[in-house]
Amino acid sequence: MQFRVLLGDLSEWKADGLVYSASSTLLPTNSVSSKIHQKGGLSFSASCRTLGMCHVGSAVMTKGYKLKASFIIHAVGPYWVGGKRGEEGELLSAYKKALHLADEKHLKHLAFASLSTEEKRYPLQRAAAAAVPLLLTEGAGFDRIDMVCTSPEEQEAYTKAAVFFWLRHLGEAAGNEQAAMMEEAGPALALLQSCDDAPDPIALSEEVKKIEAIVHPFLKLRKRSLVDIEQAASKIMALYPESRTEGV
C-alpha cells in the first residue's frame, strides 16, 4: 500500500473514497466539511439528512454525487477534553470504521482528512501519532491511502508520524526480517510526499539511497533511545521539500 501525505483540497481529490471529519449530525462544521457539502450538491446534502445521526467513534457512507470521488465516508471523531475520556480510542474507532466501510465497497484508493483536529480541538501531533500507525497496518490491503492536509503544519505532523512508524518498526525487527522490511520502508519513505502517480524509477532509487544512508547507521546502534529516533527522523524529514501539493 502506498501512503502519501500531501497538501490539497479534499473536496477536489480524485480517489475512490474520501473520508472527512464529520459532526454527529452530519452537518458541515469545519472548512473541509463545508466544501464537501457545497460541492456534493443538493442530493448529497439530502442523503446526509436522511441518514440523520452518527455516533462518535463511528462512520457512515454516502455516494459522492457531484464530487470527484464515488463514495464519501463521514467519520465522526471525538472532541478533545483533555485526553481522559477515551478520546484516542474513539478517534481510532472512527478511522477503523471508515476503513471497514471502504473495504466493504472494495475501494482501492482512499483520501483522508485529519479527523478531529480542526473544530474538535484534538491536538494535531497526538492525532497524527495515533492515526498513522493504524492506517499503515489496518489499511495495508488498499492500493493507496492519501492523507490530505490543509496546512504545512498538518503535513509535517502526519509525515513525522509515518517516519517514526517506520523507524520504530525497523528498530524492533531483527536479522532477515529487518532487511526485508527495509526493502519496503525505503520506497515508502521516499514516496511519502510524492505527487507522482508513477514516479521515475531512477529518481526513486536515488531517494531510497538517501533514506538508507540515514537509516543504516541508526540501525547499527546497539541501544536506540527516543533521542536517536528523533535525530534520524529529523534527517529524513529534511529530505522532503517544505510542501508538496498534488495536482487535482
Model-derived regions: residue spans:
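Glycine-/small-residue-enriched capping loops at alpha/beta junctions
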Residues: 1-104
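Charged, low-complexity interaction regions
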Residues: 174-182, 193-202, 216-227
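Flexible loop/turn and low-complexity linker elements, especially glycine-anchored beta turns
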Residues: 192-193, 203, 230-245
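Cationic, hydrophobic amphipathic alpha-helical membrane-interacting segments
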Residues: 207, 211, 216-218, 229-235, ...
